[in-house]
Structures are given as structure tokens and as C-alpha cells.
């Protein structure tokens, strides 16, 4: 798993012109990093959280995740006629807040429009020419206890492979939300952004 440190994350964000939150304790940088193999159907991406702990120490936690839909949804003919939504790399300021995933458990839910690509012909290759922007129900949630294949776990959501990692992310979010409010910024980068 790719594990960039504080300085690498900060530099990648700066290169893109994105904010990187360094002021204040528990001011979260919630960052997804997409692996170059889009069509893997595995949890080969990483979701990380960079923050200053209460004593001022810089921390980065990394968790296996997917930022891509599972194969099931990519080929599902009953999905949106345009194809499954795939979140575009970018920084989405204040775009997520706590809500319920499928009405079942707390997670981070989309609260502002996001930009997505589609796989219109369902060949597991992104159609970069068309960009949709809107409310797509993209959440940041968990898979199973320790999942290895994405399959049905993601229809475009950002999904952590392990329940324990997800619970840790939500613990950090809750602590941050008490200080900075309920909305959190999510940044999606690619591994190429670190080269």
C-alpha cells in the first residue's frame, strides 16, 4: 500500500493548488489516493488522514480503500444509462458530512455537488470526455470486516476495506467536527501526483 508522509501529501496538494490544513489540532486532511490500475476490483487505493494531534505532532494514518466502483456496478445494465459514476480527482471543499449509509449506519455522505466521469459502454475504461456534476449519493463508508474484493461494496463511493479503519476515520471526523463544524473537505489524488 502506498503510504505518503505528511510532507509528500502537503507537496502533492500544493502542486495542484489545493488547501492543506495545518492550523489547529485535529483539522483533518481527508485524502484518497487512486492507484494507477483502475480496473483491478481490489482495495488497491488508499485513504489517509493527515492532522495535528492535540500536542502538535503531525500524524498521518493510511487505510486500504477503493476510490473506484466494483466490477458488479461497472457492468450493471440497470445502473444509470450514462454508466456508473466515478469520482474525478479534485478537492471537494466541505462536500461531506455525517449521515447514514443506506439508512443503516453513520458514514460521511455527499452534501455538495461533485464531479464524476462515466463508463458509458461498461468496458471498465473511463470515458474522460464527459463530465457530470451533481448529487450522486457518493459516500465514504466501509466494506466488511476485512474485504479483499470491491464487487458490490462500491457503486462510486469511496470505501474503506476494513471496518476497524472506518471506525477510526469516523472517530477522527467526530473529534474534528466538534472543533470545526460538520462539513469536511475530501481531496482525491492519484499516485501520479506524487511523482
Regions found by a protein language model. Name each.
Residues 160-163:
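Soluble non-cytosolic domains of exported or imported proteins
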Residues 1-151, 165-174, 180-184, 189-195:
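Cell wall/extracellular polymer interaction/catalysis modules
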Amino acid at each position: 500500500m502506498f503510504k505518503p508522509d505528511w510532507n509528500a501529501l502537503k507537496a502533492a496538494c500544493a502542486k495542484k493548488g489545493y488547501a492543506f490544513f495545518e492550523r489547529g489540532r485535529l483539522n483533518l486532511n481527508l485524502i484518497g489516493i487512486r492507484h494507477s490500475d483502475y480496473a483491478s476490483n481490489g482495495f488497491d487505493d488508499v485513504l489517509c488522514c493527515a492532522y495535528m494531534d492535540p500536542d502538535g505532532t503531525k500524524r498521518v494514518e493510511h487505510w486500504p480503500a477503493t476510490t473506484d466502483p466494483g466490477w458488479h456496478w461497472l457492468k450493471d445494465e440497470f445502473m444509470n444509462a450514462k454508466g456508473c459514476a466515478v469520482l474525478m480527482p479534485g478537492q471537494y471543499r466541505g462536500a461531506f458530512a455525517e449521515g447514514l449509509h443506506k439508512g443503516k449506519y453513520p458514514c460521511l455522505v455527499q452534501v455538495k455537488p461533485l464531479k464524476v466521469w462515466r463508463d458509458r459502454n461498461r468496458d471498465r475504461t473511463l470515458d474522460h470526455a464527459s463530465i457530470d456534476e451533481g448529487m450522486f449519493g457518493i459516500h465514504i463508508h466501509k466494506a466488511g470486516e476485512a474485504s479483499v474484493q470491491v464487487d458490490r461494496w462500491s457503486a462510486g463511493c469511496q470505501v474503506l476495506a476494513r471496518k476497524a479503519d472506518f471506525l477510526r476515520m469516523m472517530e477522527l471526523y467526530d473529534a474534528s467536527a466538534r472543533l470545526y463544524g460538520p462539513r469536511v473537505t475530501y481531496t482525491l489524488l492519484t499516485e501520479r501526483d506524487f511523482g
